[in-house]
Amino acid sequence: MAEQQLGVLKALDVAKTQLYHFTAIVIAGMGFFTDAYDLFCVSLVTKLLGRIYYFNPESAKPGSLPPHVAAAVNGVALCGTLSGQLFFGWLGDKLGRKKVYGLTLIMMILCSVASGLSFGNEAKGVMTTLCFFRFWLGFGIGGDYPLSATIMSEYANKKTRGAFIAAVFAMQGVGILAGGFVALAVSSIFDKKFPAPTYAVNRALSTPPQVDYIWRIIVMFGALPAALTYYWRMKMPETARYTALVAKNIKQATADMSKVLQTDIELEERVEDDVKDPRQNYGLFSKEFLRRHGLHLLGTTSTWFLLDIAFYSQNLFQKDIFSAIGWIPKAATMNATHEVFRIARAQTLIALCSTVPGYWFTVAFIDTIGRFKIQLNGFFMMTVFMFAIAFPYNHWIKPENRIGFVVMYSLTFFFANFGPNATTFIVPAEIFPARLRSTCHGISAAAGKAGAIIGAFGFLYAAQNQDKAKVDAGYPPGIGVKNSLIVLGVLNFIGMLFTFLVPEPKGKSLEELSGEAEVSHDEK
């Protein structure tokens, strides 16, 4: 049976790149577009939420979210994502990739819309319902990580597998960029329709009641691309590797792949479903798994964990860093819509110049340079640029040096995406056995989200000024932006060291990497 299985799958490994591969990239990629849009668009509207729901007419500064509310709004979706990665990763191996794949998209669509419809008679009610729906939004997003990566890896040929998985993940960059463009468009329209004075001129009128629609429209827009691809996602057949290696139905796998690849794949009549090699039936918590893949799983979880502390803290709190260096004007000198526009413009510029190009550089070079070198170099360059920003921080905050700061800051994002942010997603979908692939990817991704939660909650407090008089309302003094950036640089360096635990999958079949090809070799 092993030879038949590998014979069927060899057709996938050597298949020429064709239309169906690109169709799969678009179908899976649109899920990731929505993932990134929904996770990161909240950073564009948190200051607006503070102005609307926590306005204090006696304060010289516009309203801001209290520390616990800001932490919840920024972090609750990440908590949901972590849970979803573990649950749907496990379910994808138990029930099959296709059966679970549509469910994650439905959750993302419904909860995106529901988040924008958050309600309540007072601020607490609105924030509570928003956090509730964003948790379940994150739960659906979490399922998309292991399923999209696993499906794309199992459909791809071995020559361009890395580029295909990276292309799916690169849609995350497009989603981040789209969030910025949507926020720019919506805030511009509302500014023309409902002009308002700055906060310094008139505190109450600086936030017209109509701006409450701005954040709701921005949040709900993420449901649109996901809804457009739902039909096509449900039409995708189960992956041949799951059908053959896990469900043990070679005949069905062959039929599915013949349709997908538009070619005839020969199948011998001898199908011995009852033949099982005990060496290939070890479980996740077995000694055999520990021996074969224990260090690999440690490598994928640790590097993703360390990377996401830095990546998410930087992404979610760009607005705070830009405000600290003076690239975004002081809040009191703007009205509510102007502030959304300025934050969106800054984040869009970073995404356009560094985040998005980084993703596509990975797509272009991953199957020539290899995953290991890209990840190692990415962590190294992130460390270098983070320290280059942090140690002379007082130099960068001078008005004449702000452009230099933005360039250096952009380069850390470029090498995150042409580096570990992409490779930590790709490698776990390649190196584990088919029956545990989705589960192990989910575990690796969940470790990453644990890091993201630390980044989201920790950086919020850590980046506060060391001077009590300069901290944001409700926060204790922190270690400051400079020291926070130094900590992130150290974490990037540690991530570089843990990269040595991760194998290089370039040019190898999934069965070679997972050890599932060993039975065939032994039988010969």
Curated annotation (Swiss-Prot):
Residues exposed to the Extracellular side: 46-70, 121-131, 183-211, 314-348, 393-402, 463-484
Induction of the gene: In roots by phosphate starvation.
Membrane-traversing stretches: 25-45, 71-91, 100-120, 132-152, 162-182, 212-232, 293-313, 349-369, 372-392, 403-423, 442-462, 485-505
Keyword terms of this UniProt record: Membrane, Phosphate transport, Symport, Transmembrane, Transmembrane helix, Transport
Cross-referenced Gene3D superfamilies: MFS general substrate transporter like domains (1.20.1250.20)
Statement: the UniProt record of this protein carries the keyword rRNA processing: no
UniProt cross-references to PANTHER family, sorted A to Z: SOLUTE CARRIER FAMILY 22 MEMBER
Membrane protein topology class: Multi-pass membrane protein
Spans within the Cytoplasmic topological domain: 1-24, 92-99, 153-161, 233-292, 370-371, 424-441, 506-524
Pfam families in the record: Sugar_tr
Keyword set includes Transmembrane: yes
Summary of the tissues where the protein is detected: Root specific, especially in trichoblasts. In mature plants, localized in root cortical cells and young lateral roots.
Comment field (misc): Although related to the sugar transporter family, it does not transport sugars.
Name of the protein in its database record: Probable inorganic phosphate transporter 1-2
Family matches, as InterPro entries: MFS_dom, MFS_sugar_transport-like, MFS_trans_sf, Phos_permease
Protein role: High-affinity transporter for external inorganic phosphate.
Record localization: Membrane
Biological-process GO terms, alphabetical: cellular response to phosphate starvation; phosphate ion transport
Recorded family membership: Belongs to the major facilitator superfamily. Phosphate:H(+) symporter (TC 2.A.1.9) family.
Gene Ontology CC annotations of this record: chloroplast; membrane
GO MF: phosphate transmembrane transporter activity; symporter activity
CDD domains per UniProt: MFS_PhT
